[in-house]
Amino acid sequence: MTPRLRPAVFLDRDGTLIEDKGFLGDPAGVELLPTVVDALRLLAANDYATIVISNQSGIASGLLDEVKVRSVNAEIVRRLDGDGLAIDGWYWCPHYDDGCDCRKPEPGLVHRALREHALTLTGAAMIGDRGSDVELGRRVGIPGIAVPGPFPYVGPEPDLRAATLLEAVEWIVRRGR
């Protein structure tokens, strides 16, 4: 029997789920953004898979390592677990702009997530605070949604400029599959 495919919402990590503090390697620095729990709860209630897609060039530049990235992700998991929530997949690019296929806006990590999970792009979206997030959405044929981050947005015109992650998720759910 073929598994039922779930639509995915691809989420940037820094500036979208948590405060962007530069090259965060200390789990104690994790601060969930204000509407994250409500947004993830709404996605779960509507059976969307949540997949984090993140550029972590601090690894290539020596400011971070895989252990630190995993420890920050684990702290996010711990905090969400306290609210009965989970992230379905964590993917990050450890490279610095070296032509790889996994650094956003390249679609390599989205394609990997699609292979590793029973996901569909029908009804899917990409949410992030940078132009590379919106461009990634475009490259895989899904809406790219911009949420405010610590830096002015520079990039292609998003399908939606949302004031919060929750507003972005409400738009996705209203659009349906």
Segments (PLM) and residue ranges:
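Active-site neighborhood of HAD-like aspartate-dependent phosphohydrolases
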Residues: 1-51
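Asp-based, Mg2+/Mn2+-dependent phosphohydrolase catalytic module
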Residues: 2-4, 66-89, 97-126, 130-177
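Acidic active-site catalytic centers that drive phospho-/nucleotidyl reactions
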Residues: 12-14, 55, 129, 133
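Conserved protein kinase catalytic core
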Residues: 18-20, 25, 61, 135, ...
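Active-site loop/turn elements of alpha/beta-hydrolase fold enzymes
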Residues: 20, 55-56, 149
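A broad detector of the eukaryotic-type serine/threonine protein kinase catalytic domain
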Residues: 22-23, 58, 95, 118
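Substrate-recognition element of Asp-dependent hydrolases with the DxDx(T/V) motif
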Residues: 36, 40-73, 85-98, 137
